[in-house]
Regions:
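Short secondary-structure boundary segments
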Residues: 222-223, 246, 267-268
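Acidic/glycine-rich phosphate/pyrophosphate-binding loops and surrounding catalytic core
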Residues: 2-213, 218, 227-235, 241-243, ...
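Active-site loop ensemble at the mouth of alpha/beta enzyme cores that anchors a bound cofactor
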Residues: 279-282
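Cys/His-rich Zn2+-binding cysteine-cluster or related metal-binding knuckle/ribbon modules and their
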Residues: 250
Length: 282
């Protein structure tokens, strides 16, 4: 997918759930106790570290779900770089509303900016090649949509959103079905022409069998060393899209991209990204 934003209504259910979790049954009782309802402020959402911004759309929605009268101005758009001390967003209106939405807005923005920033580092390592960086389904339960959106903001690409998006034959499928040929023949018998088929291999002889049998659009080269990946690219000779996966850490990306694979997929983009330090100041 190539989108870098979504309609607000698509994102709202995830944000509403987070607000309900945070506000609880009785709402923000601290703010109600100490802040007069007519108190107004302008708050600034600041970056405290350098990175690539994500989650500004979601932060805006969070503030507006709590109070539609808040005036929210996004100063740095999703996908843009940020520097320490830079103001990313201003929020003007009832102080109580701003405080009640603060933590949810910051949690989303910090988490997603961390993912976008790590993705951008991976993408930078592919410079000078045609290799693309893609994420996986190793996402936080319930947050896959927004975490994959953050990958796009960092310059990466998305893999499947769900098991229903494409056929991806993994090692356990191959073992249960009786081998590469058996699983590909079974897939060819039922797969629609609209459905992409990807198969995982971890040995070159399996790749050779995939090429001989046919029926796959993409081959996932799992846990192969760099030299084996280079041989796999030569064997495929452009007949299939090749995706390298398994142990794809940042320090290895440049050498893997240089082998000529089409994609490098890494679960680390979403499961290992560190939240970027953002703050909200009055």
């Amino acid at each position: 997918m190539s989108f870098t934003s979504l309609p607000d209504m698509v994102l709202e259910p995830v944000i509403r759930a987070a607000l309900m979790e945070d506000l609880g049954q009785y709402g923000d009782i601290t703010t109600r106790a100490v802040i007069p309802s007519d108190t107004r402020y302008t708050a600034r959402l600041n970056a405290r570290e350098a990175g690539v911004v994500s989650g500004m759309q979601i932060a805006r929605i969070a503030f507006h779900l709590v109070d539609p009268t808040l005036k929210v101005e996004t100063l740095v758009q999703d996908g843009a770089p940020c520097a320490p001390g830079q103001v990313l967003m201003t929020i003007e209106g009832a102080a109580a509303s701003i405080l009640s939405a603060e933590r949810v807005a910051l949690n989303f923005a910090g988490r997603l900016t961390g993912i976008a920033s790590l993705t951008a580092q991976f993408v930078a390592e592919t410079k000078g090649t045609t290799t693309r960086i893609t994420c996986t389904r190793k996402t936080t339960p319930g947050l896959r949509l927004v975490e994959k959106l953050a990958v796009l903001h960092g310059g990466g690409f998305n893999h499947r959103f769900s098991l229903s998006d494409a056929i991806l034959i993994k090692d356990n499928h191959i073992a249960a079905a009786g081998g590469v040929r058996a699983v590909l023949e079974a897939t060819k018998a039922v797969a629609s022409h609209m459905v992409k088929v990807e198969i995982e291999v971890d040995r070159l002889d399996q790749l050779e069998e995939v090429l001989a049998v046919g029926g796959a659009d993409v081959v996932l080269l799992d846990n192969m060393d760099t030299e084996t990946l280079r041989t796999a690219v030569a064997l495929a000779a452009g007949k299939l899209v090749l995706e390298a996966s398994g142990n794809m850490k940042l320090e290895r990306i440049a050498e893997v991209a240089a082998t000529g694979v089409d994609y490098i997929s890494s679960g680390a983009l979403t499961h290992s990204a560190q939240t970027l330090d953002l703050g909200l100041d009055f």
